[in-house]
Amino acid sequence: MVVMPKYKISHMLKLKLSLFTLFILANSFGQKIEKVFLDKDDAAKNCYTIIYPDKLPFKGYVFIIPGFGETAETVLEETNLPKLMAQNGLLTIIPTFQDGVLSFGVDSLSQQSFNTILKDVTSKHQLIDQRFFVGGFSIGGSCAIKYAENSIIKPAAVFAIDPPLDFERFYNSSNRDIRLSVNTEPNQENVYMIERIEKEMNGTPKSALANYYKISPYSFSDAKQTAIKNLIKMPLRIYSEPDINWWLKERGADFTSMNVTDCSAMINELNRLGNNDAVLITTQNKGYRKPDNFRHPHSWSIVDNNELIEWLLKQK
C-alpha cells in the first residue's frame, strides 16, 4: 500500500501555503526551517525543506523521504520525527524530487533527483565528512532502501516505515484486488498503481520481469538476490504494523496486499546472508494519522521516534 494524494494545488498557492506552514512550525518549535528551490520558477518539485539543529557542530545529517503524495509540510504535520532529529543535532532534510509528490521513488529519475539534492546539501553545508542517514515512509522508505543499494555515498544506516519493496508482488496483488471486486468498486489506488508500475517497469511481470528485479528494492522470486546483496553490511530497520484484521475489515485486503510481506521476507534473507543489523520492528495499535487521529496501521506514528534517533546516533 502507498499513500495517495487527495488533491492538487496550483504552484503559486502551494508555495504560499508551504512558506506559511513553515513559518508557523519554525515559531512553534523554535527551530530554523528553510525551503530551498533548485528551480526558482517551480515550487512543486526539485526542492527540499531543511531543519537546522540549534547549535554546531552537527552530529550528522539525515534525509527523510515523504510517502507518495506527501509534501514536506504534510510530513511535518504527521510526525515530530524531523523536529526531534534536528533537536538531537542532525541536520534534517525532507526532499521533493523531479516528479514532485508523485515521485515513484525507486525509478532512475527519482534516484537521480535524490543525488542532485544530496550534492546541493552537502556542498552548501560542507558535510562530506559527516555521518549520513536516510529513511522514509511508504514509497519514501522504498526510495531510501533503493538508494542505499546503489549509492556511491553510503549512508551509515537506513530506516523505512512500512515500505512496498517487491513491485512484482505489488502488481499482482493489485490485479487480484480488482479481480475480486465483482460487486464493489475497485480500490482506485490499485487501479492507478497498476498503470504506474507498468509504466515505470516498461511492462508487466510476465513481459518485463528483469526490470522488476532491477528496479524493485527486493524481489521474492529473484533467486539470485541481486538487489539486497548490496545491503549485507548495512544497518537497516524496517517498521510495520501488520494489523491483518484491520486490513480485512476496512480494505478487504489480506497479507498478500500488505507491505509487511515484502519487509519480513527481505529482512529474513538479509539475516540469512549474515546481516544481523537488519531488523524488522512490528508494532500494535500505534498507527494513527493526524490531524484527525484516525486509525490506520500504514502511518508515520508506528515509529518510536526517540528510540529510532538513539539507534541512529549509535551508528558509525
Please give the residue ranges for each predicted region.
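A domain-start/cap signature at the N-terminus of enzymes
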Residues: 29-60
